[in-house]
Amino acid sequence: MTRLIRSKKQFLIRSLHSVFYYLGSLLHSTFEMNVFIGLLLATVVASQSSEGRDESYTYKQLCIVDDKPQVLDGFDCRNQVAVARWQNAVNTTGWTFLEVETKENYCPQLQAYSAGYLEGLLSKTVLTYHLKNAQEDYCKNFTGYCSRLSDFLTENQKWIQSSLETVAPDDLYWGAVNRTYHQVSGLIDAYEGREFKPRITYELHPILYLNLNGDFYDLEKKLNKTRDPAFEQTGGKCSGLIKVAPGNADLFISQVTMSGFQNMLRVIKLYKFGYDRQFYPGYASSFSSYPGLLYSSDDFALQTSGLAVIETTISVFNTSLFENTKPVGQLPTWIRAIVSNQLARDAREWCKLYSLYNSGTYNNQWAVLDYKKFKPNQPLPKNGLFYVLEQMPGKIVYSDLTWFVEKYSYFPSYNIPFFKEITEISGFIGQAAKMGDWFKWGASPRAKIFERDHGNVHDLDSLTALMRYNDYKNDEFSKCKCNPPYSAEAGISARGDLNPANGTYEFPGQGHVNHGALDYKGTNVELMKKLQFVAQGGPTWGKVPSFKWSEFDFKDKVNHVGHPDEWKFNTLVHKWETEINA
């Protein structure tokens, strides 16, 4: 009987696949057809399976067989170029997991393309969901803006292609850019069902758009896209914290990313490349990310170089600065972040590398911590432990702030610039004059909460508690000139969905919005050695209710394919199968 039921299900799926393929063939492009078929078929398969509840990895590998590359199942072929591990446990943990490892005895471009190709194969279903949720409607009702965006990106891609084709073969920086483009090209080719053919594609593919998602924050302003107030994120985009434990016993770095709830399909990733470690000290990196993205984008990333990197986004209120953002001569943030993570040997070099080819898009405050410089229970070094970098269009400022951590034992990051020059040119002074302390460094709600509560952090559990903190109805620092007189956006982990839709607020991002904290990540000295970190998926819960799509009034307005209904997951530390010695 079980076999009969299973065969009927398989027959139904095959039959529906044929119908879906015919209907999908009526669409205009291969990409549209793939998304259409993938979503419909995945919906049927999901109803017959335990999708999102994987208890172990699925493996694929790229092997050389009879002098030809072949994709095989498993992880132990003889002439292995790359191996990838994938686990979709979003319904049990709030996360999916990916490990990709490439082997040093093959050329770097083949390694990079293979890494992307295997990721594209393994993550295709979840990537299809994420494209549906995060990308599908991006240009809906914004055809003029998207035409301008396409023109801008096309010109930028042409400049990058020209640079890659003319730069000296031994140029280390552009060599890393080349490998990054091979990796994303492999991912695109696998997703589209194309043959394995190591190359670079410069097409404006939706997967490229996913990697540019952070850069779009500012390109939308430069290219005049009008935002929906219900999706306004002026309230805050991330929270970050660097903290030294009492007696210098431990060193923590953590970050909470905030965004629209459609972006909650997440991947905890590890890339380990067989690159020359002399030139690529960050040959391996672990990070929180999203389907189809080659970098964190939160950002939270740990490197074998000993560098841990986070960022929180800074708004550009002085829009005249975008005259400095041009399609020629500049690289988007996602590429510069990857290159800096791979090539930098210390925090200062990371800042120097990241400062090259400033695009003035995805303008962030970056915090770079060098764990090599820290010795538990010993005095902090005088310099080199901790750098902060802030970017605006046309301007980057960075400095060694080891002294700050030594003096105050912490450094908080909450979407407001620290450096005076960036504060002045960004327009934050004028914004604070209009809107008050919400936009003042040291005076905003999260600044005050960090100042009051950082002293409670002494281990990973207390770090997690602070970074997931939101008690907006009772905390004095969450009060505002609003009705009701507080905002759930005024927490270390925001929950804009909890603000009443009929409330009155000082500005849209303070009120009822599709916006909140999507996760938590944090590490310490011991976990950093293995590129591991504590993670918690989904919006914060405990002092506030857990997030449920079925109870969210935006549920019919915001795509959330592949999501669990209730996001109520515990913390975890994912242990890598790949051997890591950071």
Curated annotation (Swiss-Prot):
Example GO BP: phospholipid catabolic process
Disulfide pairs here are C139-C146, C480-C482
Q: Where, per UniProt, does this protein localize?
A: Secreted
Q: Which residues form the signal peptide?
A: 1-42
Q: Whose protein is this, by species?
A: Caenorhabditis elegans
Lineage of producing organism? Eukaryota, Metazoa, Ecdysozoa, Nematoda, Chromadorea
Name this polypeptide is given:
Putative phospholipase B-like 2
Give the family from UniProt: Belongs to the phospholipase B-like family.
E.C. designation(s) = 3.1.1.-
Described by its record, this protein's role is as follows: Putative phospholipase.
The alphabetical list of record keywords is: Disulfide bond, Glycoprotein, Hydrolase, Lipid degradation, Lipid metabolism, Secreted, Signal
Q: Which residues are glycosylated?
A: N91, N141, N178, N224, N318, N502
* Entry's Gene Ontology cellular component terms: extracellular region
A GO molecular function for this record? phospholipase activity
